[in-house]
Amino acid sequence: MLFRIPTLFTLFLACFSLVSGVFGYSPMFGSNTIELNSKNFRKFVKAKGPSLVVFYAPWCGYCKKLVPTYQKLASNLHSLLPVTAVDCDADQNRAVCSQYQVQGFPTIKLVYPSSKGSSLSSTDYNGDRSYKSLQKFVSDSIPSKVKILTSEAKTQKFIQDAQNSSKVILISQKMKPTLLYKSLSNEFSSLPFSFMPAKANVNDLFNISAYVDTSDLPILFIKHPNNGTSFFSNSLNRDSIVEFLQSSIKDNNFSEYLATFCSKKSCIITIQDKDSDSGIDESIRKKYPKLHFVRLGRNTTVAERLEDTLDLGYSDTFLLSLKKSHYNAKPYGKPLRRWLEDIQVQQAGPSVSLPNDLLSKIK
C-alpha cells in the first residue's frame, strides 16, 4: 500500500538538503544510504552506474516502516551498488520526483544509464517491502555486462572479441551470475566478464583442465592477451576478487591496469625500492577513498618507462588522472599527507598534460 502524495508539497524544506554535486548520507535511512536531489541525481547515476532509489517523504508512515529494512539492505549492498534516497517533500526535488512519475510513498526503483544515448532508464519495484523481496529485485533487475556462455559458438565469439583485453571468466554450478559478479562487471566495465554454467560443458575451449580440476567449482580465472592465465584461489567475496583482478592485470599488462583501475578514479603512483617497507599509511587511504593507490618497484621496466615518459624529476610519487589527461608530481621530500592536502585546496602547483601515447609506451 502506498501513502498518496498531497496535491501541494509542503513548504517545509529538509534541513539536510545537499549541495549540488556533493553526496551525503540520508537523514532518514542512515549512513549507508546516499541522499540525492534534482540537481545531482542524473550526474550521480551516470557516474556510479545502476543505483537503487527510494523516493520518500519524511512524514510518510509507510516510509518510516521501511527504514529498518532499507537500512539493512544498504548495509549489505552498498559495496555492490549505490543505495540512495530522494526526499520528494523538499521543493528542490519536485523535478526529479515528477520525472520518475512518483505518485505515492515510498516508491522504489532501480535507475541506471541507458544503453542508448545519455538518458537514464529505470525499473519499478512492485513487490512487498521485505528484505528478501527487495534483495531479489536488485539481483534480478540490475543490468550488467556479463556475457553468458551456454554454447560453443558463444564461447568462441567471446574468446575472439576484444583480443587485446584480459577476460574474466567464472565457471559455476549455478545457472546465472550473482549480484556480486554483475556489479563487478559494471564497476570494471573495460574488462570483458563472462559466466559459464557448468552444464554448458564448454570450459575445454579455455584450455584450463591441465591446471585445475574442472569439477571443483566455482572456478574464477583471467585469460590475458599474451595467452597467460591467472587463477583465483580465495573465497568469492568482493575485496578478494578486486585484489585478484588488480594484482593479476598489474603483473601482466600495466597499461591495461591503468585503463581499468585509473580511468574512473585518479591514481597515486609511488615508485619505491622493491625491499622498502614504507607503504601507504592506511589512514591516508581511508581519508581519500576516491583515490586509487599503486606501488611500483624501482628499476622495474614499467617504473623506468614511466620515469622516461613523464617529467618526474626527483619525485617518487605522482597523481595520475587519465580522465582529465594530466599528472602532478609530489615535490621531493614533501610528506605525502601534506601534498594531498595541498592538492585538495589547489595549492600543489600546475598539473602537466599526459602524452597521448602514454598507455602504449608502458605496456
Swiss-Prot record:
The keyword Coiled coil does not apply. One of its GO terms (molecular function) is protein disulfide isomerase activity. Pfam families: Thioredoxin. It comes from the Eukaryota. Residues 1-24 form a transit peptide. Its main location: mitochondrion. PROSITE patterns: THIOREDOXIN_1, THIOREDOXIN_2. It is found in: Mitochondrion. GO terms for biological process: protein folding in endoplasmic reticulum. One of its GO terms (cellular component) is mitochondrion. Keywords: Mitochondrion, Transit peptide. The keyword NAD does not apply. Residues 32-141 form the Thioredoxin domain. This is Thioredoxin domain-containing protein C13F5.05, mitochondrial. It comes from Schizosaccharomyces pombe (strain 972 / ATCC 24843) (Fission yeast).
